[in-house]
Amino acid sequence: MGLRYSKDVKDRYGDREPEGRIPITLNMPQSLYGRYNCKSCWFANKGLLKCSNHYLCLKCLTLMLRRSDYCGICGEVLPKKLVFENSPSAPPYEA
């Protein structure tokens, strides 16, 4: 779900990846100074998105996008297109 592109996008881009997409990370590794957290709320540490030099959770990203197209922390343009780095897995189908 969500990993395939529509026919219109395939016709436009072919096999190459559409530009401007940023990866969303489900599990962040430990850094030298501890866990990665959302720079806005400081609570979320899963499902983080990279915004220039810091990370944001989906909730804070949505709230910031409602106000403006620019990040309230760093002033850069907020990311709008997402790509999952690890595709979700499902158990094998057994008939």
UniProtKB/Swiss-Prot annotation:
Late-budding domains (L domains) are short sequence motifs essential for viral particle budding. They recruit proteins of the host ESCRT machinery (Endosomal Sorting Complex Required for Transport) or ESCRT-associated proteins. One of its GO terms (biological process) is viral budding via host ESCRT complex. A zinc finger (RING-type) spans 38-74. Its main location: virion. Plays a crucial role in virion assembly and budding. Expressed late in the virus life cycle, it acts as an inhibitor of viral transcription and RNA synthesis by interacting with the viral polymerase L. Presumably recruits the NP encapsidated genome to cellular membranes at budding sites via direct interaction with NP. Plays critical roles in the final steps of viral release by interacting with host TSG101, a member of the vacuolar protein-sorting pathway and using other cellular host proteins involved in vesicle formation pathway. The keyword Membrane applies. This is RING finger protein Z. Transmembrane segments: none annotated. GO terms for molecular function: RNA binding; zinc ion binding. A motif (PTAP/PSAP motif) lies at residues 88-91. A lipid is attached at G2 (N-myristoyl glycine). Gene3D superfamilies: 3.30.160.310. Myristoylation is required for the role of RING finger protein Z in assembly and budding. It comes from Whitewater Arroyo mammarenavirus (isolate Rat/United States/AV 9310135/1995). HAMAP family: ARENA_Z. It holds the Pfam family zf-P11. Belongs to the arenaviridae Z protein family. It is a lipid-anchor. It is found in: Virion; Host cytoplasm, Host perinuclear region; Host cell membrane. Keywords: Host cell membrane, Host cytoplasm, Host membrane, Host-virus interaction, Lipoprotein, Membrane, Metal-binding, Myristate, Viral budding, Viral budding via the host ESCRT complexes, Viral release from host cell, Virion, Zinc, Zinc-finger.
